[in-house]
Amino acid sequence: MRLSRLLIGASLGVALSSTVFTAALADVKFGSLYPISGSLALLGEESARGLELAVDEVNAAGGIKGEKVVLERGDAVDNNQATGEARRLISLVGVKAIFGTYSSARVIAASQVSELAGIPYFEMGAVADEVTGRGLQYLFRTNPTAENMAKDSVDMLIKGIAPGLGKDPKDMKIGIIYEDSSYGTSVAGHQEDNAKAAGLTVVLKSGYPSNTVDMSSLVLELREKGADVVMQTSYQNDSVLFLQQANEAGYKPLAIIGGGGGYSMQPTADAVGHDLIDGVFDADYTQYAVNTSATPGLTEFVEAYKAKYGSQPRSGHSLTNYVGAKAIFQALNAGEGFEPDQIVSAVKALDIPDGQAAAGYGVKFGKNNQNERATMMGMQWQDGKLVTVYPENAAIAKMRFKK
């Protein structure tokens, strides 16, 4: 009798341990690689939240192919750490893919590690040309690019801002300033090309380190060149610094057009003051004050964000990462498995039409594994809020101009 009890107990123990082992096998691990400390932490963390919300949503619906998605975080505080964290996630954690990363410089560094290891890397926020311009087999980008941002900046000037000011855009003088990493350099280069192709006059194109603590000489140079339109591609600190020092110097261009980054963040408006930022334009990812008929699912995303994090989203970076991650998860669920080539095949077959995602655009990967359907929008700060003013089908407000 005692022996039979022991045998039953042993059998039960084996069954239980087998169940636990099977449950462990039912998890699929992905890396979440963003700058979550250091100077880019605010936007990095905001971006990571979008991925986390997409994971919550897919797990609530049964996971991917019946397997629960588990995220392992990595901190891409600088380029060296981004590389080291990519190695750790791949070699020690055993992730099936990496998602990230917001910073162009960080993803350019980290994706070289994943490419050599044959592990897919999904970039959902960095815009620089070089991200997808290196011909990597395992890197895919879901978000719009520096070229999209630059084109929208110039188009918005020609089609909306100049007419609203009663000006011929060819009579306006443009100053282009930018933080000098891959992000700012790419956007500024395309802005100059687009402006010149449209017959516009660029009087200054000047870069600076994003950690600069004084932009007064650049403000002076813009004024001396007679720039009445300033296009700035920047992170938060340098966005705040430029707006404050331009104001202190009494430099008031007819229009300022931000290139995402700090110009899309509510904390930037709060830091400089709503009166100072009022009227400033911005070309960037889809934001939240937008015509929701063009962005199905956006309202539900905002509600999920508030429920998880206890506040409104701080910028459109979370939304862009959420949309990208959801698209990849959809592809993987329709795919054959989680081996690298299976993931690549599944993602290449993805075909989401325009107007079916919360950011308003679709997803289909084309040349260099870039999402060829990704687009940006034009916004303006009005009464302390960033509202969509361009294109017309997504706008909820008309452009305002100071008399």
Swiss-Prot record:
Residues 1-26 form the signal peptide. Keywords: Amino-acid transport, Signal, Transport. Disulfide bonds: none annotated. The keyword DNA-binding does not apply. The keyword DNA-binding does not apply. It holds the Pfam family Peripla_BP_6. This is Leu/Ile/Val-binding protein homolog 8. It comes from Brucella melitensis biotype 1 (strain ATCC 23456 / CCUG 17765 / NCTC 10094 / 16M).
